[in-house]
């Protein structure tokens, strides 16, 4: 690869690292072109999947201010640059790796922090952002209903007491 081509590749990878909220490094040795296309299609909505030379990826990661990825840059490496939901991408990669043993999850980073293979799998075990938001909204709605009932109880009790006093005064007169 000519020096200008390498510089261009490093610049492109650096931009991808900077624009992504997370990245997952994988080893794709032994996967067919069709299988790689299936993998790309499964994560297309939330990530870009690109094959990268290890030395160029290491330089680009350092240029982007990311440390700790060099330990995962050995063998044939492809990187999923996540621009959408990292949980969805981690799940898709984990599920694809279960079905295709030749795909190996190496590690990656999220929000600037390095992740190992176990970290990627933990990320994949999380529920999606939408599910977590729905659970949070449900908890908030329940809490608000309880708070409203709590504030209404003294008011309704006071109204019933006043009505009872009026009834008692009406009977006494």
Swiss-Prot record:
One of its GO terms (cellular component) is large ribosomal subunit. GO terms for biological process: translation. Disulfide bonds: none annotated. It holds the Pfam family Ribosomal_L10. InterPro entries: Ribosomal_uL10, Ribosomal_uL10-like_sf, Ribosomal_uL10_bac, Ribosomal_uL10_bac_type, Ribosomal_uL10_CS_bac. Belongs to the universal ribosomal protein uL10 family. Forms part of the ribosomal stalk, playing a central role in the interaction of the ribosome with GTP-bound translation factors. Part of the ribosomal stalk of the 50S ribosomal subunit. The N-terminus interacts with L11 and the large rRNA to form the base of the stalk. The C-terminus forms an elongated spine to which L12 dimers bind in a sequential fashion forming a multimeric L10(L12)X complex. This is Large ribosomal subunit protein uL10. The lineage of its organism: Bacteria, Bacillati, Actinomycetota, Actinomycetes, Micrococcales. The gene is rplJ.
């Amino acid at each position: 690869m000519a020096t200008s081509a390498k510089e261009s590749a490093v610049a492109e990878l650096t931009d991808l690292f900077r624009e992504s909220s997370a990245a997952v490094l994988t080893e794709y040795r032994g996967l067919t072109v069709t299988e790689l296309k299936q993998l790309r299609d499964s994560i297309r909505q939330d990530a870009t999947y690109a094959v990268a030379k290890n030395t160029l990826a290491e330089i680009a990661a350092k240029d982007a201010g990311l440390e700790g990825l060099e330990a995962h840059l050995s063998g044939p490496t492809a990187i999923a640059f996540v621009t959408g939901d990292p949980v969805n991408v981690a799940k898709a990669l984990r599920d694809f790796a279960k079905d295709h043993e030749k795909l190996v999850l190496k590690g990656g980073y999220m929000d600037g922090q390095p992740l190992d293979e176990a970290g990627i799998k933990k990320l994949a075990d999380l529920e999606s952002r939408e599910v977590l938001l729905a659970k949070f909204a449900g908890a908030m709605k329940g809490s608000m209903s309880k708070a409203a009932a709590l504030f209404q109880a003294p008011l309704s009790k006071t109204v019933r007491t006043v009505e009872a006093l009026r009834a008692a005064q009406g009977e006494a007169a």
